[in-house]
């Protein structure tokens, strides 16, 4: 009788098994997302594959598997996962956009453009496809379509300040600084594999170079260091053992999470540099760093004066810039600023700073720049 009753009970609740299976899929997807955030991309892929074993037609699981595969540089496999997500859910805007991204990385430009255009058509209020499409047009030298793409985003009210910045860069119109929203969004998107891309793919070694010079000039081990635009903490890692206090400032929360995971920083704050410095005490730091940060600010005069005020007498200000010809800073087509050496030297001449070191230096990829180390007199 009991067995018969149980059979009747389960027959009267036909959705029980499906609900349990659905919960299992959701749990696997959430586990994969957490592993992705922690940088465990192979573990994330395994979790999404478990979800797909239970639900082969789950479009989100295919999409997220694509993300995990992309982060492992398995680009063709990632493209296949995105395409499967699109087959299952043709209007999946994020899948079209990310398919375009991996196709661009695979140097399949025409296919990438088509994917981005489809993402824009399907999600006309979603900003990332406009950004990717406009940038790819820019790389291809198609400034007319790049400008039209940025203008379309502005017309729809999408992240207007950021797209105006990119449009100004495209048209050769130099502005004072990049909008905080632009810089924040840029690095929020870079955070997942920022170090690998910057170091392994672009040969970025500015933090190590700055650290070598600073260690020679200020060999004490209890220094108070302020790391402006600290990102994932590459400068903190390069200067390990040289400080008693290490403060990091950055606009991007995801980048700060990476820095926090290093357990090197005394304090980490999500803020613009200018806003944070307004409230910082005077003569509070032995060293101020700005590695690959000033490229998002054109007019550096207010920043130099503020930094000089926060340094102790004899303190060091170490930074890198991209180099421009002429006498004035310029906004480049990349959306970054470049500064002439003469312009930099005109700034510190009136701010109580003197040059200790200044030399050309490879910044990243095909970008050359200059490193300065100044001392407060």
Positions of predicted regions on the chain:
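Conserved alpha-helical positions within TPR/SEL1-like repeat arrays
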Residues: 26-37, 60-71, 94-105, 128-135
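Conserved beta-strand signature within the Rossmann-like core of class I S-adenosyl-L-methionine
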Residues: 314-322
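A short acidic, Gly/Pro-enriched loop at the edge of an enzyme's catalytic core
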Residues: 278-288
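A short glycine-rich, Lys/Arg-flanked "PGG" loop and its adjoining helix->strand segment in the class I
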Residues: 301-313
């Amino acid at each position: 009788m009991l067995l018969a009753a149980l059979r009747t009970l389960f027959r009267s609740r036909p959705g029980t098994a499906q609900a349990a299976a659905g919960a299992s899929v959701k749990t696997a997807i959430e586990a994969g997302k957490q592993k992705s955030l922690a940088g465990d991309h192979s573990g994330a892929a395994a979790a999404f594959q478990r979800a797909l074993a239970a639900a082969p037609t789950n479009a989100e699981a295919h999409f997220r598997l694509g993300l995990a595969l992309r982060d492992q540089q398995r680009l063709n496999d990632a493209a296949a996962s995105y395409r499967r997500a699109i087959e299952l859910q043709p209007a999946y805007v994020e899948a079209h956009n990310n398919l375009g991204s991996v196709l661009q990385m695979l140097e399949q430009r025409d296919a990438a453009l088509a994917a981005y255009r489809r993402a824009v058509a399907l999600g006309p209020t979603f900003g990332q496809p406009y950004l990717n499409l406009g940038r790819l047009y820019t790389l291809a030298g198609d400034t007319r379509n790049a400008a039209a793409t940025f203008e379309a985003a502005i017309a729809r009210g999408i992240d207007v300040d950021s797209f105006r910045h990119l449009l100004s860069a495209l048209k050769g119109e130099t502005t004072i600084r990049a909008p905080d929203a632009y810089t924040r969004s840029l690095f929020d998107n870079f955070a997942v594999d920022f170090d690998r891309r910057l170091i392994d793919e672009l040969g970025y070694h500015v933090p190590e170079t700055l650290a070598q010079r600073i260690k020679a000039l200020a060999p004490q081990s209890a220094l108070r260091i302020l790391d402006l635009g600290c990102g994932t903490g590459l400068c903190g890692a390069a200067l390990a053992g040289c400080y008693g206090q290490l403060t990091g400032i950055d606009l991007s929360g995801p980048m700060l999470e990476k820095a926090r995971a290093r357990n090197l920083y005394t304090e980490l704050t999500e803020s613009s540099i200018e806003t944070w410095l307004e409230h910082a005490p005077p003569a509070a730091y032995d060293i101020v760093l700005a590695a690959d940060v000033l490229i998002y600010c054109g007019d550096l005069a207010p920043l130099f004066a503020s930094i000089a005020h926060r340094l102790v007498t004899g303190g060091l200000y170490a930074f890198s810039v991209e180099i421009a010809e002429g006498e004035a800073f310029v906004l480049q087509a990349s959306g970054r600023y470049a500064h002439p050496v003469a312009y930099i030297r005109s700034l510190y001449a009136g701010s109580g700073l003197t040059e200790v070191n200044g030399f050309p230096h490879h910044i990243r990829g095909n970008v050359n720049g200059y490193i300065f180390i100044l001392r407060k007199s």
